[in-house]
Amino acid sequence: MSQDKQLSLFAPISRDERQAQVIRAWAKANGRATVVAATGTGKTRIAMLIIDKLKYSNPTIHTIVLVPTTTLQEQWITELDQRGLLLNTEVFVMMGASKHNYKCDLLIIDEAHRVSSEVLSANLVNTQFRYILGLTATFERLDGRHEILAKYAPVCDTITMEEALFNGWVTKYKDYVVVIDVPDIDTYNSYNSEFNKAYEFFNWDFDKAMSMVGKDSFKNRWEYAKELVPNNYEHQKEMFKSITYYATSFMRSMQNRKKFVQNHPKKLEVAQEIIKWRNDKKIVTFSANVKMAESFKNGYVYTGKEGKKKNRITLEEFSKMPNGCLHSCKMAIEG
C-alpha cells in the first residue's frame, strides 16, 4: 500500500489531495487504467485535470470522451468549454461511436462499466489510443464482462463511499429497506421457475445463455448443438430446436421478472405513501422507466421525453422550491 493511501485511511484529507493521488496512480499505470470512485467524489474533475496536464505538455493532444447518453454528452461539452479544454476534444455517445474507427491520444470513458457490453465493446476494439482513462462507480458486472475493460484499462485506484463519508466529501445518508408484500407473488414465482429451467439447461452459464440470442446467435446455437451431440446431424437438428426453445424461454422469463419487479403497482403505492408523510421535504425519486416516473400523482417529471429547454426549466424550478418532488428515471441518475 502506498504512503498516500495509508495516510488517507487514518486522517481526513481534502478531496483535491485524494484526486491528486488518483492521478498519480493513473500515471504510474502508464496512463492506461480505470478509476473506480463513488458518486460525488469528482470523477469528472479528475478527468479534466488529466486533460489539462496533458495539454500543458502537448497543446495539440487529441482527446475523445465516450459517454452513455446525450445528457452526459451535453454536460461534458459544457464543462470542457468552461474550463477551456474543448479544443481538440470531442465527446461522443457510446452507441454511435461504436460504429466508427476513431484515433486519439487520450480516450476517456465515462460510466466505463457499460463499454464492456456485447455491442459497446466495439469502442475498445475500433478506437486507436495512446492513453485510456475509465471512470466508473461500479467496475464489476454481474455478467463478468468487466474483464473486457480490464484488458485495456485495469483498475488503478478506488475511492469507496466509506472513504468519501469519512473525509466529508459527500453528505451522510441512511439506507432504508422497504419490504413489499405483493398479492400476485405466484406470477413472479412462475416466471422464476421458467427462468431457472432455462438457465439450468445452459449449465447455469450466463454468458453461454446470452450468446444464444442476439448477434451471431444462430451460429452459436448450431455450434452448441454440435458440441452436445457430435457426429449425428439428425440429433443435432433436434438439439438445435431445444436450444432455441430454452434460449427464447431464458430471455422471455428474464424480461418478465424484470418488468414485474420494476413496474409493480405496489411499489408506486408504497412510494406515494412515504412521500405523503414527508410533504415538508425535498424528494427525488428514480424509476426504471419513463412510464413509472410519470405515474406519480404530484411533483415534477424529468425524463428524456421532454426537450432540453423544458428539462432545464424543470430542474431550475425544482431547485428553487423549499420542498416538493422530482420524479425521474435513468436520465437524472447519470446526470
Which residues does each predicted region cover?
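Walker A/P-loop
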Residues: 30-50
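Conserved two-lobed SF2 helicase motor
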Residues: 84-106, 319-334
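Conserved helix-turn-beta segment of the N-terminal RecA-like "Helicase ATP-binding" lobe
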Residues: 56, 60-63, 70-91
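Conserved pre-motif I regulatory segment
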Residues: 2-34
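Conserved RecA-like ASCE P-loop NTPase motor core of nucleic-acid helicases/translocases
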Residues: 60-69, 282-289
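Conserved interdomain linker/interface between the two RecA-like ATPase lobes of SF2 helicase motors
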Residues: 155-280
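Post-DEXD/H (motif II) to motif III coupling segment of the RecA-like Helicase ATP-binding lobe
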Residues: 117-173
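Conserved helicase ATPase core of P-loop NTP-dependent helicases/translocases
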Residues: 74, 282-286, 291-334
